[in-house]
């Protein structure tokens, strides 16, 4: 029984961390954070959400097959939300807003660098029709910069493995 209560409390704490991590992404960071998964496995310093993970805040939605929240023990020896240092969303990763969709194999948030990295067949779709594809996208939450990398360098690769960009004509 205590395990279920602790898991429930940790889920609330995780959602609070998600609010902080996604505040830069969400247009409504004061909205409540909701989440669901088929299973939650709580361990010291690690909580694993498995099976159709769905986290929402305002108009932002994150989907994945599995999500791992890594923490460091707090001063009192119990897991503290302040100690969460890494969030991994693994398998069929989607980051969705009304104006943008990012998808890839996985997304990783690192508190130490304030970065959000998406890897594996990354596709960034913008509402205006622009598309960027690559193998890796790194978004810096502090300064708002983004870097997209491919797996192949040079013209000999063609478009396979390189960063590809499609910009829609905005002129009338």
Regions found by a protein language model. Give the residues of each.
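Mature-chain termini and adjacent capping regions
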Residues: 1-172
């Amino acid at each position: 029984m205590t395990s279920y209560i602790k898991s429930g409390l940790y889920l609330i704490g995780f959602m609070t961390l998600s609010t902080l991590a996604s505040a830069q992404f969400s247009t409504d960071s004061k909205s409540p954070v909701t989440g669901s998964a088929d299973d939650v496995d709580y361990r010291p310093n690690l909580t694993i959400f498995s099976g159709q993970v769905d986290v929402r805040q305002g108009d932002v939605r994150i989907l994945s097959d599995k999500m791992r929240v890594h923490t460091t023990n707090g001063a009192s020896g119990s897991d503290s939300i302040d100690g969460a240092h890494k969030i991994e969303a693994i398998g069929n990763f989607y980051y969705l807003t009304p104006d943008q969709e990012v998808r890839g194999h996985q997304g990783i948030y690192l508190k130490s660098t304030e970065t959000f990295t998406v890897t594996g067949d990354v596709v960034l779709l913008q509402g205006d029709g622009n598309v960027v594809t690559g193998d890796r996208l790194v978004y810096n939450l502090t300064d708002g910069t983004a870097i997209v990398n491919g797996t192949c360098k040079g013209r000999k690769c063609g478009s396979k493995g390189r960063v590809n960009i499609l910009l829609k004509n905005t002129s009338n």
